[in-house]
Amino acid sequence: MAAIAFIGLGQMGSPMASNLLQQGHQLRVFDVNAEAVRHLVDKGATPAANPAQAAKDAEFIITMLPNGDLVRNVLFGENGVCEGLSTDALVIDMSTIHPLQTDKLIADMQAKGFSMMDVPVGRTSANAITGTLLLLAGGTAEQVERATPILMAMGSELINAGGPGMGIRVKLINNYMSIALNALSAEAAVLCEALNLPFDVAVKVMSGTAAGKGHFTTSWPNKVLSGDLSPAFMIDLAHKDLGIALDVANQLHVPMPLGAASREVYSQARAAGRGRQDWSAILEQVRVSAGMTAKVKM
């Protein structure tokens, strides 16, 4: 069993630390919330007066904090982790922070001779309690291999996202998609109500289409990702259908700002001559808008 320092005992961190204890690991904990520390001490953890004390003699130091500034302060501030850290220890940041902050933290740790990787998590606090988190590991092959037994005490699935900083990048993309889709789903649900359409009917239909399953696994693989833009569903038709939905929403006084923004992207694609291409070619349009080179010839 490993000697672990766990810093950050919030809604996610506390149950994650508890699962490490249940697996028999030696845990030294620190948090500014004394009650959160007491909760873990009652389960067998050892309290630390500061991050440096928590890190002393630890093989792994796990940080699970609300933002990147706090992570930096915990690592490099007064009585920070670096003051008590041994050079053979591995720091694992599991916080959700800005990727560029992660890159700088890892670089600064390396400059001091320390090892650090990023492993943000997916799923919810309920999964943190049951030890079924999705673990998104960004690190060297050696770091991922070394950390895996510790990480799997807190999760049920580990994805090796690639090198250092890649874990937080895939977490960022996943969060962007799920959070934006939550708002777009709300627009669709409210339009459903305004049209007096039974919600269960809409759910039944969408659960079997790209609307419910997402384009990454439905419309894209056999089209734009395979270099094929021949239309299964033309951008011109998608633009028309989206326009009808927005017109109906406007008549019913249902605000749909995300839908309107989406239609603008389709309008740009049509203006670029993509109207008769498959709707998955929207990926190429957004690439070009981002200053990148399209991967599929028009």
Curated annotation (Swiss-Prot):
Quaternary organization: Homotetramer. Dimer of dimers.
Keyword NAD: yes
Gene Ontology terms: cellular component: protein-containing complex
Keyword NAD tagged: yes
Protein name: 3-sulfolactaldehyde reductase
One term of GO molecular function: 3-sulfolactaldehyde reductase activity
NCBIfam families with a match to the protein in the record: PRK15461.1 (NF012005)
Signal sequence residues: none
Chain residues that bind 2,3-dihydroxypropane-1-sulfonate: 123, 174-178
UniProt activity-regulation remark: Inhibited by the NADH analogs tetrahydro-NADH and hexahydro-NADH.
Stated family: Belongs to the HIBADH-related family. 3-sulfolactaldehyde reductase subfamily.
A single GO BP: 6-sulfoquinovose(1-) catabolic process
PANTHER family: 3-HYDROXYISOBUTYRATE DEHYDROGENASE, MITOCHONDRIAL, 3-HYDROXYISOBUTYRATE DEHYDROGENASE-RELATED
Pfam families cross-referenced by the UniProt entry: NAD_binding_11, NAD_binding_2
Record's catalysed reaction(s): (2S)-3-sulfopropanediol + NAD(+) = (2S)-3-sulfolactaldehyde + NADH + H(+); 4-hydroxybutanoate + NAD(+) = succinate semialdehyde + NADH + H(+)
Positions annotated to bind NAD(+): 11-12, 31, 65, 96, 240
Outcome reported for the amino acid change (mutating residue 122 to S): 25-fold decrease in catalytic efficiency with SLA as substrate. 5-fold decrease in catalytic efficiency with NADH as substrate
Keyword annotations: NAD, Oxidoreductase
Induction line: Induced during growth with sulfoquinovose.
InterPro entries, per the entry: 3-OH-isobutyrate_DH-rel_CS, 6-PGluconate_DH-like_C_sf, 6PGD_dom2, 6PGDH_NADP-bd, HIBADH-like_NADP-bd, HIBADH-related, NAD(P)-bd_dom_sf, SLA_reductase
Summary of the function given for this chain in its UniProt record: Reduces 3-sulfolactaldehyde (SLA) to 2,3-dihydroxypropane 1-sulfonate (DHPS). Metabolite profiling studies showed that the enzyme also catalyzes in vitro the NADH-dependent reduction of succinic semialdehyde (SSA) to 4-hydroxybutyrate (GHB), and that it could be involved in the metabolism of SSA, and other potentially toxic intermediates that may accumulate under stress conditions. However, the enzyme exhibits a 42,000-fold greater catalytic efficiency for the reduction of SLA over SSA. Shows no detectable activity on the analogous glycolytic intermediate glyceraldehyde-3-phosphate.
Effect of disrupting the coding gene: Deletion mutant displays reduced tolerance to the cytotoxic effects of exogenous addition of succinic semialdehyde.
Protein encoded by which gene: yihU
Active site: 171
Superkingdom field: Bacteria
Disulfide bonds listed in the record: none
